[in-house]
Each structure stands twice: as structure tokens, then as C-alpha cells.
């Protein structure tokens, strides 16, 4: 029988605890401190040294925080009106304070004095209005647009004050205002997806772009005029190493000072002299994303629970992540927006088979379920270079086969 094929990102949903590793100073003469490598300062003056951190990074085609949802480098180059503290609480960012009028559902933000863009231009409320309206414009196709659907009006009161009137209360709005603000004076009239600005970004953050060697490295230098004070590390190099295994090798060889590793690679460094590992419980997750743009899942929506019941999250955490993770049931796991009462679809292959059979599926001679003469199955697409995603997808695929769903 002909198998139905579609592209589906299949990764078990879990909040992984990953490890960042770097070499310790003082362990031996060749070791490098986690946070800095000392080199001669560019000024050449005796006794001066600059500190450089080399970080193993995925590749970038652009740096565009307003249009793209993710990007580690964004936090070093840009700021939002609000920010997170070490405990993930919302704290002031570019805005020193704000008020909320419950009667009109209006937030009013007051911007700090003296904020400058990396090119020396003054940061104003006009930049805030420009950025959020650009995100909201459907023609720009921003991944972040859904966060601002409640915004009815943005008003610039003066250079240092901007207000947002919402259609209804939104408990997450201050979280959304951690969004990086972009410079109106450099982007007004530009294509928000294709502007050259996103290859030479100018922000307000603690670091500014020095150089970008495509496919090799992105070099940032500290912003001496940063509103919270200049960073202690003079230079941060995002060395492009897209493969997790290659990052681990370069960390061990000393080519990298810092890398965010999957648990299997991190395990090799935990007892190794000269390295420090930090276990971080994060909100990062891997999830099954059904491609509803393909009518296969529109027509077979009723068997989606069978896929969910076929996945043993804890077994994957134990085998792929060496126990360094927690079973997750939605993208919101570790904050106040998490709803513990949602259906968890815990591992239950018998229930998965009941759902398939109730939907009219029958087993073929190979032991896999068919429906209307077509085998239930799909192509599993997974991001290359990230070994934990690959391993998770392979483990999930095997569990699906054990239920009777082919791939």
C-alpha cells in the first residue's frame, strides 16, 4: 500500500536541563577561564589586557529580533522596555517605570534619560512606537505579531513617554515588552525582512557589532556607554559551529571558551580537569508540531491523540538526555501562565491503539495501521546539527512504530 507522506517536525516535548561548559583558570597553564581569555589590548599599552569570550554558536543569516522569535545574540545587542532579572521576574529595562490604568487598559512607559543607540543617536519613544507597529503590520510577516493583537493604539506622549491602549487586559503584556526595540532613524521606509540593517545591526545593548564574517564568526565589542555600565568582558566572539558534536570537540581543544551542550556531550566534561559545567533548568522544549497546512492532518485530526499517547516522554528523557530534563505538556511549563489542568496525554500505547481502531484503522500484514487503504505514517523532519533533536526524533519514531504507526 502507498504510504501517506508529509513533513512533520517530530520531537518529544520536554524542558531540557542543558549544560554550559568552559575551561577553568588555575587548573593548568593551558586552561582558559570560562568568562575570559586575556590578550594584549589593542592600545598596546603595557599592563593593559582585554578579555575575550569565544562562544560556540549556530549560524545566523540575519539579526532581526522584531521579525524572528529567537536568537541568542539579540540580548547582547538590543534591549526592551522591560527585562528579566536572575529569577525571571519582570523588571525595568529601557523604561525606568510604568503605570497601568485598569479602566482604559492602558500601559504608560517612562523611558530612562540618556539612552543612546550604538551610533550615538538619542533613543526616544518614537523608536518604541515604530518597532511595535512594524511587528503588528501583517505585511511584514513578523513571528512576534500574535503577542500584540490586543494593542489598539500606541501614543507617543513625548520623547520619553509612550502609551499602549489594549482592547482587553493581558497578563503577559509586560513580558511581551521585553521585545528588542529597533532604531526608527535607520529603518523607517526599509523592508523589515530584507533590509541591510539586519546584517549590520545598531542597538542599545551592552555590546555592539564590530564585524561579521559570514559562516565563520560574529564579533561584538562592549558598549562603553551602556546604561547599566560597560560590561566586564571586552569582546564576545560568536564562532559559528552549527554541529553540537563539533562544539564539544572545539571546547575540549580550547578553540571555544563556552558552549551550550546537550546532556550527552556535557557528560564528558563533568569530571574532566580544567572545565566547569553549569546545569541550567530552562524553558527550552522539544515538541511535536503538526503541520496543519497539509490537509493530511486536517482529514486525520481524530488520530492525533493516538500519536501523543504513543510517546513515552520519560523514557526519552532518560535515554537521550540522561535524565537531565522534565516531561512537558505544552510550551509553557515553568511560569505563571502554565495550566496544569490541560490534557497530558501520558504514555499509553493501548489507548493509542484504541483510538486508531475506533477511527476505522486496521493493521496490515506488516503490523502497521492503515486507513482507507493508506498506511498511517509520515516523514519525520528534524533540524540538522542538533544531536539531541535527532536522537529524540529517532526515539519517538521507534515508539510510534511499536504502537503501529509507521514513519
Pin down the residues of each PLM region.
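C-terminal motif of bacterial Sec signal peptides marking the signal peptidase cleavage site
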Residues: 17-20
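Short, well-ordered beta-strand elements
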Residues: 49-61, 96, 106-109, 128-131, ...
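N-terminal lobe/hinge region of extracytoplasmic solute-binding protein
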Residues: 56-102, 133, 202
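Gly/Pro-rich hinge or "lid" segments in bacterial periplasmic/extracellular proteins
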Residues: 85, 89, 178-231, 235, ...
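Aromatic- and charge-enriched surface segment that lines or borders ligand/interaction sites
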Residues: 96-141, 163, 297
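Surface-exposed binding/hinge segments that line
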Residues: 99, 103, 145-187
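Ligand-site clamp/hinge motif
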Residues: 223-269, 397, 404-407
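Append "and occasionally in soluble cytosolic enzymes with long acidic Gly/Pro-rich linkers
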Residues: 299-398
Amino acid at each position: 500500500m502507498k504510504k501517506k507522506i508529509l513533513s512533520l517536525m517530530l520531537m518529544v516535548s520536554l524542558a531540557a536541563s542543558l549544560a554550559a561548559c568552559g575551561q577553568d583558570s588555575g587548573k593548568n597553564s593551558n586552561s582558559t577561564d570560562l568568562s575570559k581569555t586575556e590578550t594584549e589590548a589593542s592600545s598596546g599599552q603595557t599592563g593593559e589586557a582585554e578579555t575575550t569570550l569565544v562562544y560556540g554558536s549556530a549560524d545566523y543569516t540575519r539579526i532581526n529580533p522584531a521579525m524572528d522569535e529567537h536568537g541568542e545574540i539579540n540580548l547582547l545587542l538590543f534591549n526592551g522596555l522591560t527585562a528579566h532579572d536572575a529569577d525571571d521576574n519582570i523588571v525595568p529595562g529601557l523604561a525606568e517605570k510604568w503605570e497601568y490604568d485598569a479602566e482604559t487598559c492602558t500601559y504608560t512607559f517612562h523611558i530612562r534619560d540618556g539612552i543612546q543607540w550604538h551610533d550615538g543617536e538619542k533613543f526616544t519613544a518614537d523608536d518604541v512606537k515604530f518597532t511595535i507597529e512594524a511587528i503588528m503590520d501583517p505585511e511584514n510577516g513578523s513571528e512576534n505579531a500574535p503577542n500584540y493583537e490586543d494593542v489598539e493604539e500606541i501614543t507617543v506622549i513625548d520623547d520619553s513617554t509612550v502609551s499602549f491602549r489594549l482592547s482587553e487586559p493581558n497578563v503577559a503584556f509586560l513580558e511581551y515588552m521585553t521585545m528588542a526595540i529597533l532604531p526608527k532613524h535607520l529603518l523607517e521606509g526599509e523592508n523589515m525582512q530584507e533590509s541591510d540593517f539586519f546584517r549590520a545591526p545598531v542597538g542599545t545593548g551592552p555590546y555592539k557589532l564590530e564585524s561579521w564574517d559570514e559562516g565563520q564568526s560574529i564579533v561584538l565589542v562592549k558598549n562603553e556607554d551602556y546604561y547599566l555600565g560597560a560590561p566586564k568582558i571586552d569582546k564576545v566572539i560568536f564562532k559559528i559551529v552549527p554541529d553540537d558534536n563539533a562544539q564539544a570537540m572545539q571546547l575540549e581543544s580550547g578553540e571555544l571558551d563556552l558552549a551550550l551542550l546537550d546532556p550527552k556531550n556535557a557528560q564528558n566534561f563533568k569530571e574532566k580537569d580544567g572545565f566547569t559545567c553549569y546545569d541550567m533548568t530552562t524553558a527550552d522544549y522539544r515538541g511535536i508540531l503538526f503541520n496543519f497546512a497539509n490537509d493530511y492532518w486536517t482529514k486525520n485530526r481524530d488520530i492525533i491523540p493516538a500519536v501523543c499517547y504513543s510517546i513515552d516522554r520519560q523514557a526519552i528523557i532518560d535515554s537521550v538526555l540522561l535524565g537531565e530534563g522534565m516531561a512537558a505538556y505544552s510550551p509553557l511549563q515553568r511560569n505563571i501562565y502554565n495550566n496544569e489542568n490541560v490534557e497530558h496525554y501520558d504514555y499509553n500505547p493501548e489507548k493509542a491503539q484504541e483510538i486508531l481502531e475506533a477511527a476505522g484503522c486496521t493493521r496490515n500484514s506488516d503490523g502497521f495501521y492503515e486507513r482507507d487503504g493508506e498506511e498511517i505514517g509520515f516523514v519525520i523532519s528534524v533540524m540538522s546539527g542538533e544531536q539531541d533533536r535527532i536522537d529524540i526524533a529517532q526515539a519517538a519514531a521507534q515508539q510510534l512504530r511499536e504502537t503501529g504507526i509507521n514513519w
